[in-house]
Structures are given as structure tokens and as C-alpha cells.
């Protein structure tokens, strides 16, 4: 006994399972999205549904490296699952969108948000994580409204394992498809072509501690200095849609590259990565640029240790990673190198 994974072919050959999947289509992108309907269990970290008959669907509901789902198929997980599922809190008649438990903007935008566009219902209750920001909730409301979908209420998930009855969960789409959808659906048409510097002065990590040394250089080149923390997501879309050049320290807000026009120049000031587990972070924004035809440039900055780590990071990120990785430090930029970089 255990959790049984069904691939796409298995689903198609199992009439009972296949009837539990709806398929919605966005003609503009030739994209399909399967939506599981019925009863299922999941946790609010992985959003990996398991049916009451112990079936799972890795091909459809994985959004991380597939190796990160291996624990679902162990005897230990199955034993705990069988023991605890009768105590799981039950929700009814929901669409499970989910959001990042750490409220990571990159993950919310590139993994969760595009799935909204495939929701077929016109009146919904929507499940998201309680840690989602008001800014994200407002954006979700706006997207639903623009699609003619009435949001009756949000249902907030904590860090827990839940049972959902008579509910739906849309599949997770490839990053390539998500980027295409976000760019075509949300990008604004702006005639202005602006030069933008994104400050992280109010962020917890990767603040440029000698940023004041760089401001004169930006001002002499007519850059706008913008703190995205103060802007709604709709306003952030405006900023990136109108940008000719973007300079920024590494930030989840660079996920907004998906709203840029082809040919936009993106300059990323990066921490010095040292470990294999950082490879995804290292190439994250250069990959987005390659998908969109943007021109990508990067330079490294020196790490400056931070004394106080915020509670959200301590909760969701391994302590060794926090201590080792320069991703969780501030940045010191050598001015002469920086001037050569942006010139």
C-alpha cells in the first residue's frame, strides 16, 4: 500500500479518474489546463493533491523539481497520512489556487497567478495561503473581476494538511507557458521608454549598503529611482512595461521582467553564489530574459552580513542556507566597476 502516482497515459486509460478532470483552453496561447474536481487532500506548502483513493498526479501537479516530491511515495509518509487524514480540517466547494506560504513574489507570479486564467466558474470561493499580502489579494481580485468571475470570498490556508470536498485545483503549468501568458495578457502598451533603478532600501536582504554612492550616477543618466514595495502590482506592471533599461539588485520583484518588451535591457546586481543549491537563483532572471528577447547583463557585489533575520525567512528557509548563502546578506558595490557595468 502507498500513494500511487498516475501519469497522463494512466489517467486517460482510467475512465473513473479521467472523468474527474476538466480541461480548459486558452486559444490565444494554444494552452490547455487540466483541473481536478472532487475530493482530495493536500498540504499548503506543496499543493500536491492526493485523492481519497490514494492517487496522485505528479505530471500535472508538480511545480518544483520532481525529486522534491519523492517523500510522498515513502512508507513513512503513507503511514502518517493514513494516521492523520481523519483529523484534517475539511473545506467544501472551493477552488484551490494556493499562494506561496512565504509570500514570495516570484513564486506567486510565475507559478500560481497564471492558473487563474483557466478557471471556468463564474462564482467562486478561492483558497490561498494566509501569508499572502494584501497587495497580492487585491491583484487576484482585479484579475478575477476582469475575467467576469465573482469572488464570493477568500478562504485562508495555514501551514497544515487539509481535505477538500467537491472542490477543484488547476494544474501547474510550465514556466515557459506562464511567462508567455503573463506577458501577453498583462503587459501594457506604453510609448514612454524609461530608465529605471529599483532600490531595495526597505528590504530585509540584498540592500546595496553604499547605494548613495550610486545615486548621482543614476541621476546624471536620467534614471527614475523606484521602490516597488510602495507600488501595487498593477503599478509595477506599468513600470516594467514602460522600461527601456532596468537596473536592480537581485530581487523577487525582477519577476516583473515578464511584463517587459522585447529588447529591454536588464542589469542585475547579484550576490556571489557559491553552492549548487543556488543554481536556480543564479540563472533565474537571465532565463526569463532569454524567453522574452530581453538583453541581460549581470555583475557581482560583495556580501555584507546581516545580524537580524526576519521571522518569515527563519520559518521557511533552512538555517544552514541562511548562514551560508550570500542571498541572505546585503551587498556592497564597487563604484568603478558599477560605472563600467551600466555603461
Regions found by a protein language model. Give the residues of each.
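The feature primarily captures lumenal catalytic ectodomains
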Residues: 1-343
